[in-house]
Amino acid sequence: MADLDDIKDGKDFHTDKPQTNTLFALKGCGALDWGMQSRLARIFNPKTRKTVMLAFDHGYFQGPTTGLERIDINIAPLFEYADVLMCTRGILRSVVPPAINKPVVLRASGANSILTELSNEAVAVAMDDAVRLNSCAAAAQVYIGSEHEHQSIKNIIQLIDAGLRVGMPIMAVTGVGKDMARDQRYFSLATRIAAEMGAQIIKTYYVDKGFERIAAGCPVPIVIAGGKKLLEREALEMCYQAIDQGASGVDMGRNIFQSEDPVAMIKAVHAVVHHNETAERAYELFLSEKG
């Protein structure tokens, strides 16, 4: 039985002050459950509402591509500088130290390779395994306009439904159908469809003309893919323009880990995303940090 002899009656209830609720003001997340908002708050810095994701999931269809031959040697030194790690469960379990304590966006689609039709994907991770791995989100490709468009949308819907049951955000990644142009109209279509299906984050490509319309027409946060390797100055300019036009962050791989100095590059990207540095100033930072 509890000892009640020394219990004191509470008196300081501040009855003159109504309870306040602190909102996490991330685009499109106001109606989400607490657990999902909590995961999103680990992905997106609550102060800047931006993120720098380090993508090294390419091996799920490309194999050991340049820069990813040895994750433990080439990629692990970058972990501490990233806000979020994006990888497959195989790499997460075999290479990523649990003590690194970084939020993970788990690649959850697969079953294809560069030798076959890329859009022919399936859900490759059960949601209970994503939870078991303490993931903060799961990601899958959606191929609007491709041969397997219907299946890729079904994959996203399946993951979204499973994610809602456990409070797991889903990031839809817009793969490009082979007959579709990489322009504002296509990415406005693809990002909006994925958001309408219920994805909480969209990963897409930056385009020079009309990106602000893509971002404005998407009701949830957009992060841009790095895409093919660019010169460092060009990659930083792309980052700056995307953030300036409404992106909520970047999910970069090759433009970081294939850089002349990956650590210096991710620091420069961080400066653009979280501190609103121009591409020019970020490039100066890259040069000063370069080993």
Curated annotation (Swiss-Prot):
Keywords: Cytoplasm, Schiff base, Transferase. Its main location: cytoplasm. It catalyses: dihydroxyacetone phosphate + acetyl-CoA = 3-hydroxy-2,4-dioxopentyl phosphate + CoA. GO terms for cellular component: cytoplasm. The keyword Transferase applies. Coiled coil: none annotated. It is an enzyme of class 2 (transferase). It comes from the Bacteria. The active site is at 203 (schiff-base intermediate with substrate). Its EC number is 2.3.1.245. Signal peptide: none annotated. SMART domains: DeoC. It is found in: Cytoplasm. GO terms for molecular function: acyltransferase activity, transferring groups other than amino-acyl groups; fructose-bisphosphate aldolase activity. NCBIfam families: PRK08227.1. Belongs to the DeoC/FbaB aldolase family. Homodecamer. Involved in the degradation of phospho-AI-2, thereby terminating induction of the lsr operon and closing the AI-2 signaling cycle. Catalyzes the transfer of an acetyl moiety from 3-hydroxy-5-phosphonooxypentane-2,4-dione to CoA to form glycerone phosphate and acetyl-CoA. This is 3-hydroxy-5-phosphonooxypentane-2,4-dione thiolase. It comes from Salmonella paratyphi B (strain ATCC BAA-1250 / SPB7). The gene is lsrF.
